[in-house]
């Protein structure tokens, strides 16, 4: 971690310089404006404050730190507001933490462009959610004076310590490990802005049990990776042209949907298996479409009455995986289906556990990989019976 820190600090500085000097000005040239709260005009400020009351305030939970309330748990990669409030009657200072609810709300809140008051107004105006919260802290701490607010972000160790050889039930062991990870691994990075007072920094370091080498002082906004959400804006001129991919010519007449739609005649259709029996096919993804090659192969295997069984390894799968849907359909069609599901896919463990259970409930025989190793490879084996053609069973 110390070696990483040495390389990371200059990169973080460069990142903030690029954000201030290049990205924000370039976005503004294309009428995309990211405003700080203090830059808002009266109409924009009123709109933001109203939005806070209606949409943000109800999901906030401020947590104070005092002898009766220990330092709250801070989840991995969460963005937080550290508030220092003062009781005007006693003069007592108190620290409180407010978590920025990014799972419920977008990191950047769009402000109606007609409120800009400019003749050539930006088309897209937004403000960071944490700024909306920070400048409305008085609503969370009525009767208190807000001495200051500061943002901070925590990164926790996400490694799962699993001893495969000692686990009677790998899935159960993994679920227990995931619960421990959610409860929080050791803090390996604390990010704070350079304007945060030293006493607040020390309070955070003590409360989070952070060493000096795990403290990163950032000269700018935290969590700049959330800027990725701006790519959803309808600005086609700023987007690289997407590559559509193609269907290999050799499989052009092997698409079941074309047969179903009448785009090709039954005597023109060639199943993928009949094509592969004659020649090997080398695919280049993403230039060759996955949907009309591998996905079509699995779908035809699931529905072909000559297919006896399917065996496949699964590492990372989407939440609406068509491959898994095809495997389930194959099992329901009476085929012998076996899936090796690698449960230990980093940050996809929950997803893989749910899919493994769903596959088992559908009649698929599921195994969980090789003890002590992680299975990354993507392999599928399909056994097809050709007894009606007096040919031996083939494996594809």
Tell what function each PLM region has.
Residues 10, 14, 56-59, 74, ...:
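Primarily the HKD phosphodiesterase
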Residues 212-226, 313-314, 340-344, 367-373:
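A generic structural motif
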Residues 387-396:
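Conserved small/polar residues in nucleotide/adenosyl-binding loops
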Residues 37, 86, 101, 155, ...:
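Generic beta-strand/beta-sheet core signal
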Residues 1-309, 324-326:
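N-terminal non-catalytic structural scaffold regions of very large proteins
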Residues 379:
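Active-site PLP attachment segment
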Residues 375, 383:
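Conserved phosphate-handling catalytic cores of large alpha/beta enzymes
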């Amino acid at each position: 971690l110390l070696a990483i820190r040495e390389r990371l600090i200059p990169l973080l500085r460069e990142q903030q310089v690029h954000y201030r000097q290049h990205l924000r000005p370039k976005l503004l040239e294309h009428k995309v404006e990211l405003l700080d709260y203090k830059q808002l005009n009266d109409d924009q400020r009123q709109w933001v404050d109203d939005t806070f009351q209606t949409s943000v305030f109800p999901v906030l939970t401020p947590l104070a730190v005092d002898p009766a309330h220990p330092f709250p748990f801070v989840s991995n990669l969460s963005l937080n507001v550290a508030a220092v409030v003062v009781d005007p009657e006693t003069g007592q200072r108190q620290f409180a933490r407010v978590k920025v609810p990014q799972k419920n709300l977008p990191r950047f809140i769009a402000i109606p462009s007609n409120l800009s008051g400019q003749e050539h107004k930006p088309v897209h105006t937004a403000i960071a959610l944490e700024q909306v919260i920070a400048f409305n802290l008085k609503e969370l701490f009525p009767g208190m004076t807000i001495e200051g607010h500061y943002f901070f972000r925590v990164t926790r160790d996400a490694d799962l310590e699993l001893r495969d050889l000692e686990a009677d039930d790998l899935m159960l062991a993994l679920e227990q490990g995931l619960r421990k990870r959610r409860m929080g691994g050791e803090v390996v990075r604390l990010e704070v802005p350079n304007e945060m007072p030293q006493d607040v920094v020390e309070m955070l370091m003590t409360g989070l049990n952070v060493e000096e080498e795990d403290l990163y002082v950032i000269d700018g906004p935290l969590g700049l990776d959330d800027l990725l959400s701006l790519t959803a804006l309808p600005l086609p001129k700023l987007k690289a042209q997407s590559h559509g991919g193609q269907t290999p010519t050799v499989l052009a007449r092997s698409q079941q949907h074309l047969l179903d739609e009448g785009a090709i005649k039954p005597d023109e259709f060639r199943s993928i298996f009949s094509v592969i029996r004659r020649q090997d096919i080398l695919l280049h993804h993403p230039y060759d479409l996955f949907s009309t090659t591998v996905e079509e192969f699995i779908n035809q295997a699931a529905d072909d009455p000559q297919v006896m069984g399917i065996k496949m390894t699964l590492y990372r799968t989407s939440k609406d995986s068509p491959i898994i849907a095809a495997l389930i359909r194959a099992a329901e069609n009476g085929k012998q289906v076996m899936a090796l599901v690698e449960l230990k896919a980093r940050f996809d463990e929950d997803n893989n556990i749910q899919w493994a259970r769903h596959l088992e409930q559908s009649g698929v025989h599921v195994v969980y990989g090789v003890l002590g190793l992680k299975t990354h490879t993507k392999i599928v084996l399909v056994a097809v019976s050709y007894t009606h053609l007096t040919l031996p069973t083939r494996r594809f």
